[in-house]
Amino acid sequence: MLGRQGLTELFFESVEPELAELPMVKFLKRFREGDYEFEGIRNDGIELESEVEFTHVIPCGPEVLPEEGTVLDPASPAVIKWEEVEEVVDPAATDEEGETICTDPENLGQDLGIDSYQVIVENDDIHLIVDLTSDDRSLTVPPELLEDNTLYIFEVLAKEESGNQTITEGYFCTGPDLSPDDCEDLFESL
């Protein structure tokens, strides 16, 4: 049975340990920079082979708006905005709370090239995924997709030329009957 299964996409993902448990610099030592070869055989017997470069150039997460807990008018478009990502994660540095610190890529001898952004907006009824260019800085969600008194979670992904990506998550609610505190309560109840 397993011999007849195949893949349409392949992503290497894991549940990374908290930085307090395993500092990023140690985590990245497990996956050294360099070229990696992948080989496989399709169901029809054709051999596949690929070589990819793995880098430690990790873009910092985009700074996003609206701020978490913002309540928007459902009759108006919701505009998700972000700043251009110009910094990278410094794997050797964290702040007092164990969060990563961003720095100019030149400080680490790196070049950062944002290839594209992706925005995901979702709740129980919608799952919107939009791919955007590296020049784009906003996504407008039309009011036709918004419902009254509803929580929406969004993610803005910054995708680096190497394929590395970082996600910033946010959320907003629509009115007219929800307050910012209600919106926060809805998010925390997930």
Question: What feature does the model see in each segment?
Answer:
Residues 115-119:
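Short beta-strand elements bearing conserved aromatic residues within extracellular beta-rich modules
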Residues 1-19, 124-131:
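Extended, solvent-exposed segments with strong compositional bias
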Residues 72-111, 141:
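Conserved aromatic anchor
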Residues 11-38:
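Ligand-binding face of N-terminal immunoglobulin V-set domains in extracellular IgSF glycoproteins
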Residues 44-51, 159-189:
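Extracellular fibronectin type III
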Residues 46-63:
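Proline/serine/threonine-rich low-complexity linkers at boundaries of modular beta-sandwich domains
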Residues 23, 126-128, 134-142:
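Short S/T/G- and acidic-enriched coil/turn segments that sit immediately N-terminal to beta-strands
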Residues 31, 37-45, 143-168:
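Beta-strand-rich modules
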